[in-house]
Amino acid sequence: MSRLLLAVAVACALVQHCPAQDWAKARLNNSPRHGEWVEIKSGDRTIKAFVVYPERKDKAPVVLVIHEIFGLSDWVRGLCDQLAENGIIAIAPDLLSGQTFSDPDGARKAISALPEPQIKADLDATSDYALKIPAGNGTLAVCGFCWGGGWVFQYANMNPKLKAAYSFYGTAPDEQAKVANIACPVYGFYAGNDEHVNVTIPTAQELMRRAGKKYEPVVYGGAGHGFMREGEKPDANEENRHARDEAWARWKTLLKQLP
């Protein structure tokens, strides 16, 4: 695991881990939209992915969702449904396909140990699948959260087919080579109380500026790491709830700009 992604893993571990997400599961179960599990061939492996379709009469853009270090949780599946609610086909690969864990610590350790070539291969396989979805319009973007947010930047540097990248509180690149191949705008969503991650933003801004790339980070004051999930909880504090609402409002505007 790279130094930056390891830093994200540590930051994620400091967030209250995901116990039973009954509130997220209830929202998902009550959704009118179609969601399904699919199997995708990735080399000699088969991975699972969760796909949710929007209710619309025309073809839609597809957003690849890279989950947190907790794995493909009910919250991540619920977020896919919320993307579909906003007209997007969302697909989230389970990067721990074939593994089960009794607690979040087990998932954290397993994800931290995943080989980077395997992660890239699984994301590539999911991207290829996504671009062939009959209801898709050929536009592909990527988003990720925490550990997945760090991978958003990394994967944007690997996949020239991406039209946009949305990184939520993931560490940003620290070397020119890590942004050299980025061919799409990168939008960052960061928590004010998350200096461990935010300290990486200025370097990335300079690297992207030198490379002539678009990078627009926004820091949401008062929020903590993981605010997109924490702010959705029934007992969320006001700072996280407000940051989530503001981030979603911005994200919806950006999603509408996808071709």
Tell me the role of every PLM-derived stretch.
Residues 209, 214-259:
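C-terminal catalytic histidine-bearing segment of alpha/beta-hydrolase fold enzymes
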Residues 5-16:
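Bacterial N-terminal signal peptides
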Residues 182, 188-190:
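Short beta-strand/loop motif that positions the catalytic acidic residue
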Residues 193-198:
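Acidic catalytic loop of the alpha/beta-hydrolase fold
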Residues 24, 28-32, 36-131, 228-233:
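Serine-hydrolase catalytic machinery in alpha/beta-hydrolase-like enzymes
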Residues 161-171:
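A conserved short beta-strand
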Residues 134-145:
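Alpha/beta-hydrolase fold nucleophile elbow
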Residues 144-148, 152:
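Gly/Ala-rich beta-loop-alpha elbow adjacent to hydrolase catalytic centers
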